[in-house]
């Protein structure tokens, strides 16, 4: 019996919608990252993007435990000397709530071209409205 290797053109991708309201950030991000990679499928192949599309709504209502709401810091660097910028979780969730979930999921995906392709299948929205009703997403309860 030969080992099965999925081919990118034969992978069937479904659309799922996740409501992040009241859910813990890390627990929801691990499940999303796993679904984006396709690890829930029998035909999972590590070097092929076999994952599904994930829509996350209500990103502004995600929950964090402990003192992370005030103490967690996100860093970015412009590439120039002295170009490091820092922003706390509570300020970032008010300014760009989508970035909180995107940063958590992106850190759990592979680094490189395959990880970037997986990350592009993640759609995050701050509120309850999204622009993907035509894809008829299935509700994913996490």
Curated annotation (Swiss-Prot):
Gene Ontology annotations of biological process type: negative regulation of translation; translation
Domain of life of the native organism: Bacteria
A UniProt-annotated Pfam family: Ribosomal_L13
A cellular-component GO term for this protein: cytosolic large ribosomal subunit
PROSITE patterns: RIBOSOMAL_L13
Family annotation (InterPro entries): Ribosomal_uL13 (IPR005822), Ribosomal_uL13_bac-type (IPR005823), Ribosomal_uL13_CS (IPR023563), Ribosomal_uL13_sf (IPR036899)
Keywords: Ribonucleoprotein, Ribosomal protein
GO molecular function: mRNA binding; structural constituent of ribosome
Subunit structure comment from the entry: Part of the 50S ribosomal subunit.
Family statement: Belongs to the universal ribosomal protein uL13 family.
Function according to Swiss-Prot or TrEMBL: This protein is one of the early assembly proteins of the 50S ribosomal subunit, although it is not seen to bind rRNA by itself. It is important during the early stages of 50S assembly.
Database matches in HAMAP family: Ribosomal_uL13
Record's protein name: Large ribosomal subunit protein uL13
Source taxonomy: Bacteria, Pseudomonadati, Pseudomonadota, Gammaproteobacteria, Aeromonadales
